Amino acid sequence: MAFTPFPPRQPTASARLPLTLMTLDDWALATITGADSEKYMQGQVTADVSQMTEDQHLQAAHCDAKGKMWSNLRLFRDGDGFAWIERRSVREPQLTELKKYAVFSKVTIAPDDERVLLGVAGFQARAALANLFSELPSKEKQVVREGATTLLWFEHPAERFLIVTDEATANMLTDKLRGEAELNNSQQWLALNIEAGFPVIDAANSGQFIPQATNLQALGGISFKKGCYTGQEMVARAKFRGANKRALWLLAGSASRLPEAGEDLELRMGENWRRTGTVLAAVKLEDGQVVVQVVMNNDMEPDSIFRVRDDANTLHIEPLPYSLEE
């Protein structure tokens, strides 16, 4: 029986989110299997995959030779290899790039659309899932596997879970939670990722930014001690020579329209407005507030005022749940 995605509802901020089950259609799964999986990924992504345990999931970036990110990945061990979750809009081009050197290695790299991605968040999310699984992931053990299901734990912006499972289990979970949980689509998970300060790289921004411009170093997504990987020289130079002048910011406020990925914003300079930044993602919440994830200069004043281009409404900087101090 096929699994049907849920219809959209206006997303809610994490502090007020009721128990919610989400279909994550805007994200997609991919895998690498085979004897050389670990070695191959170690030479392709910014994180140190050789140090990853079965209990961990990591942010990582897959970069081009100039250190610009094709995409960022949520990576975890899966079977005899690895699986990762990324935005669906970048999966096909990212896999094309990743496969370029695979002919020399014992690996199989493939999209995985057999499995379903679900998110569970909101009020008493843990209690709701505790009735359905014998063990749940936590800060100490962030990945748990049970049968056909892998559960990933996230701390920010509030405790939530990402479930990778087969269609039968996805339908079972939906049936079990339907009575107590609201159902929503990817936009709610996107709103939570924006709040958490997790970079959202869609097709419009693929190949545009080095990982540090999206705060990946603050999210444990870059190892500066591991051996070579594609783009490493540029990523290392940005750290050790201070070449990176950008950071990922969270803005909130009002806007008469949602800015699109790749668009710039405007910064108030006295009486005037100056174009600045690149939008990665934006969502309008049910209370009318707009939240925007944007890459801008890393020295913005905390009281800076922004707006969507030519808009009458304004946006301000909100704190992220992690520090950029090194």
From Swiss-Prot:
Q: Give one GO term, molecular function aspect.
A: folic acid binding
Question: Which subcellular locations apply to this protein?
Answer: Cytoplasm
Q: Where does folate bind?
A: 27, 189
Q: What is its main location?
A: cytoplasm
Ordered alphabetically, the record's keywords are:
Cytoplasm, Folate-binding, tRNA processing
Gene3D superfamilies from the entry? 2.40.30.160, 3.30.70.1630, Aminomethyltransferase beta-barrel domains
Q: Supply the SUPFAM superfamilies for this chain.
A: Aminomethyltransferase beta-barrel domain, Folate-binding domain
Gene Ontology BP annotations = iron-sulfur cluster assembly; RNA modification; tRNA processing
Keyword Cytoplasm included in the entry's annotation: yes
Specify the superkingdom.
Answer: Bacteria
Instruction: List the GO cellular component terms.
Output: cytoplasm
InterPro entries attached to this UniProt entry: GCV_T_N, GcvT/YgfZ_C, tRNA-modifying_YgfZ, YgfZ/GcvT, YgfZ/GcvT_CS, YgfZ_barrel
Signal peptide stretch: none
Q: Which Pfam families does the annotation name?
A: GCV_T, YgfZ_barrel
What function does the entry list?
Folate-binding protein involved in regulating the level of ATP-DnaA and in the modification of some tRNAs. It is probably a key factor in regulatory networks that act via tRNA modification, such as initiation of chromosomal replication.
Q: Name the protein family.
A: Belongs to the tRNA-modifying YgfZ family.
* Protein name according to UniProt: tRNA-modifying protein YgfZ
Q: Which organism is it from?
A: Shigella dysenteriae serotype 1 (strain Sd197)
